């Protein structure tokens, strides 16, 4: 697998030497975030490859995270591109920059957005087809093991889940709320349940390797009410309500200056969008193979030509098709 990756990159570098000269006038240096989680790193590697080999750019990856990326944009106007920006985690800082015209959103880089919710294993629904909603679970909590697997302390979902548990009166219904100590133990609890085909009920999100590997069914908590959900995101509220998790907008944004300077790259990045199920599959493969983000990106580029070829312009498509046969 690693040899395949290096062979492709090696072949690409030869073409890139010629194409970068031809494109030097049209694409210069580009900086893009390399966030500290797997899905964003794959997106960055795919975008980097397309920009370098298709458009002749010189791409710099900037190690980052949501809050630091937004702060850097506000203070320095860098990096040029921020991808997999979870809008519900940016607070007012990003919206102020957008209103001021300093940054522009180009694309929903994950479609239909980040997914959050309460899940049960598919095998449990096959065994108990009446389990279609959280209301069904609370009517007979023993079917799911009488336990709700909650987020660790410090996570935003922990606050929302705690408020939902109060609003739904879960403890009174006979449901234990088990607060995991880490994301690792939460993920392990799903793996252990699947191995033994045991009941499991709890919170999870995507795109993640877990949802890519294990077939889970998202149960309806209720209608989506954005005001109720926003209120549930606050600690120690007196009036928690019931609302399902709305899809989380996950964006690619650029500085206004970069969009003006590199319109062709801005157009490319406006089209780069990964289906959440596709990303789940890539993340599961990456974990199983102990692969790097670069290797996962190459897998995507080799297997999803019908997708990425629609993102690039005709000239870039010709160059990339010569590399990724």
State where each predicted segment sits.
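Immediate post-signal peptide segment of exported/extracytoplasmic ligand-binding proteins
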Residues: 22-32, 139-146, 309-311, 325
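Short, well-ordered beta-strand elements
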Residues: 25-39, 57-62, 145-149, 269
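An extracytoplasmic/periplasmic, membrane-proximal ligand-sensing/linker region
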Residues: 28, 39, 164-173, 180-197, ...
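Short, polar/charged alpha-helical segment
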Residues: 39-57
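Ligand-binding pocket segment of bilobal, Venus flytrap-like solute-binding proteins
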Residues: 71-73, 79-83, 154-234
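A conserved helix-loop-strand patch within extracytoplasmic ligand-binding domains
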Residues: 102-152
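A bilobed periplasmic-binding-protein/Venus flytrap-type ligand-binding module shared by bacterial periplasmic
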Residues: 116-126, 249-261, 284-285
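C-terminal lobe and pocket-closing loops
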Residues: 208-273
């Amino acid at each position: 697998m690693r040899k395949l990756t290096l062979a492709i990159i090696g072949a690409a570098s030869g073409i890139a030497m010629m194409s970068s000269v031809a494109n030097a006038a049209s694409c210069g240096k580009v900086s893009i975030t390399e966030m500290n989680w797997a899905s964003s790193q794959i997106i960055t590697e795919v975008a980097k490859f397309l920009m370098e080999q298709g458009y002749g750019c010189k791409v710099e990856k900037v190690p980052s995270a949501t809050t630091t990326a937004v702060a850097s944009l506000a203070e320095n106007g860098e990096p040029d591109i921020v991808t997999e920006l979870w809008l519900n985690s940016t607070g007012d800082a990003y919206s102020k920059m957008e209103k001021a015209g300093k940054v522009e959103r180009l694309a929903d880089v994950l479609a239909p957005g980040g997914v959050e919710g309460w899940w049960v294993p598919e095998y449990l629904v096959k065994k108990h087809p009446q389990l279609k909603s959280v209301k069904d679970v609370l009517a007979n909590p023993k079917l799911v093991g009488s336990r709700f697997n909650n987020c660790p302390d410090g996570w935003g979902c922990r606050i929302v889940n705690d408020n939902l548990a109060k609003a739904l009166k879960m403890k009174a219904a006979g449901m234990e709320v088990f607060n995991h100590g880490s994301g690792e133990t939460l993920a392990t609890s799903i793996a252990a349940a699947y191995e033994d085909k045991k009941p499991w009920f709890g919170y999870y999100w995507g795109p993640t390797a877990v949802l890519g590997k294990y077939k889970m069914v998202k149960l309806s908590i209720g209608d989506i009410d954005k005001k109720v959900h926003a209120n549930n995101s606050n600690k120690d509220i007196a009036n928690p309500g019931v609302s399902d998790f709305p899809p989380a907008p996950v964006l690619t944004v650029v500085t206004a200056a970069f969009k003006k300077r590199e319109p062709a790259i801005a157009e490319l990045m406006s089209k780069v969008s990964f289906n959440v199920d596709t990303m789940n599959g890539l993340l599961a493969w990456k974990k199983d193979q102990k692969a790097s983000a670069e290797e996962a990106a190459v897998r995507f580029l080799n297997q999803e030509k019908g997708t990425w070829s629609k993102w690039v312009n005709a000239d870039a498509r010709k160059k990339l098709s010569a590399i990724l046969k």
